[in-house]
Design a protein with these regions (language model features):
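Acidic, proline/glycine-rich short linear motifs
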Residues: 38-66, 99-102
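Small/aliphatic-rich secondary-structure junction motif
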Residues: 3-52, 74-80, 150
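Feature marks short, surface-exposed loop/turn motifs that line or immediately flank catalytic pockets
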Residues: 41-43, 90, 120
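Aromatic/hydrophobic pocket-lining residues that form π-stacking "cages" and hydrophobic walls in ligand
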Residues: 22, 71, 100, 134
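Short, well-ordered secondary-structure micro-motifs
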Residues: 18, 45-48, 94-97, 124-125
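Gly/Ser-rich helix-loop-strand patches that form or flank binding pockets
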Residues: 24, 104-151
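Structural beta-alpha unit
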Residues: 73-112, 150-151
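General small-molecule cofactor/ligand-binding pocket signal
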Residues: 36, 83-87, 143
Length: 151
């Protein structure tokens, strides 16, 4: 069945639920999980008029490392073989979905797991969600996990 599960994480409730589902699947199948965080600062242009780009990117990287450390702790506690990766440069600015798909392809993932709604702010309304992009771009199976608060 599944040997390699790519898990995209972003620290949202939906992402946390996706992590739980990836653990369940990996436990059942013996799969390895690769937790991936894509650091992308393109939302900043929609949210603030002035910012220090370097400070913002470092803040995003720090947050990504924290999210990956938390995921790693849960994967270790469950006894799952795993790796983590912080991608600092998306395929192109704002192209988180394309970056996730490219990473899944490069790693030969059997399945991509991610939450349906993450931390994307106003940009989601303008450009569509990361999960929709992954589904439309990937030739691999994709498992989308809804958060409990979605309607």
């Amino acid at each position: 069945m599944y040997q390699r599960i790519l898990l995209a994480v972003d620290g949202s409730q939906s992402s946390d639920l996706a992590l739980s589902q990836a653990i369940t699947l990996a436990t059942a199948t013996g799969a390895e999980v690769k937790a991936l965080f894509v650091a992308d600062d393109s939302d900043a242009f929609f949210d603030v008029a002035y910012f220090d780009a370097r400070a913002l990117m470092e803040s995003i990287r720090t947050f990504g490392r924290k999210v990956l450390t938390e995921a790693e702790g849960k994967l270790e506690a469950a006894g799952i073989r795993h790796t983590t990766q912080l991608v600092e440069k998306p395929v192109a600015p704002g192209q988180i979905s394309a970056t996730i798909v490219a990473q899944a392809d490069a790693w030969s993932a059997d399945l991509i797991v991610l939450g349906t709604h993450g931390r994307r702010g106003v940009r989601r309304l303008l450009m569509g969600s990361v999960s929709e992009g992954v589904v439309s771009k990937s030739s691999r199976p994709v498992l989308l996990i809804r958060s409990e608060v979605e309607g």
